């Protein structure tokens, strides 16, 4: 799980305005951090299939947010992909 201070750090880096916590960019960045954490977790816990299902769900959520952002504003989409290093 993501620690509160780490989450606040991510929000601070990707927010669009001062009180922004729910923009697609922030949500995508938080989900990406969770995906990275779970990927590392699976390197040592190969048989943790329950969490692997959760990972697939998170990846699907992120994909949906990325599709939404691509449809609404292509420049913001390209920017967030480049910042996070997500391959597409």
Swiss-Prot record:
Cysteines joined through disulfide linkages: none
Record flagged with keyword Secreted: no
The protein's assembly and partners: Part of the 30S ribosomal subunit. Forms a bridge to the 50S subunit in the 70S ribosome, contacting the 23S rRNA.
Superkingdom of source: Bacteria
Keyword check for Magnesium: no
Record's function text: One of the primary rRNA binding proteins, it binds directly to 16S rRNA where it helps nucleate assembly of the platform of the 30S subunit by binding and bridging several RNA helices of the 16S rRNA. Forms an intersubunit bridge (bridge B4) with the 23S rRNA of the 50S subunit in the ribosome.
UniProt record, GO biological process: translation
CC terms in the record's Gene Ontology section: cytosolic small ribosomal subunit
Record GO terms (molecular function): rRNA binding; structural constituent of ribosome
Name of the protein this chain belongs to: Small ribosomal subunit protein uS15
Pfam families linked: Ribosomal_S15
Keywords: Ribonucleoprotein, Ribosomal protein, RNA-binding, rRNA-binding
Family: Belongs to the universal ribosomal protein uS15 family.
Species: Geotalea daltonii (strain DSM 22248 / JCM 15807 / FRC-32)
């Amino acid at each position: 799980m993501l620690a509160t201070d780490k989450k606040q750090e991510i929000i601070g880096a990707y927010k669009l305005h001062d009180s922004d916590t729910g923009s697609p960019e922030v949500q995508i960045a938080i989900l990406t951090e969770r995906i990275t954490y779970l990927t590392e977790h699976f390197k040592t816990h190969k048989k943790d299939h329950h969490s692997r299902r959760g990972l697939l769900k998170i990846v699907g959520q992120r994909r949906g947010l990325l599709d939404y952002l691509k449809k609404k504003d292509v420049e913001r989409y390209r920017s967030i992909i480049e910042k996070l290093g997500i391959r597409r």
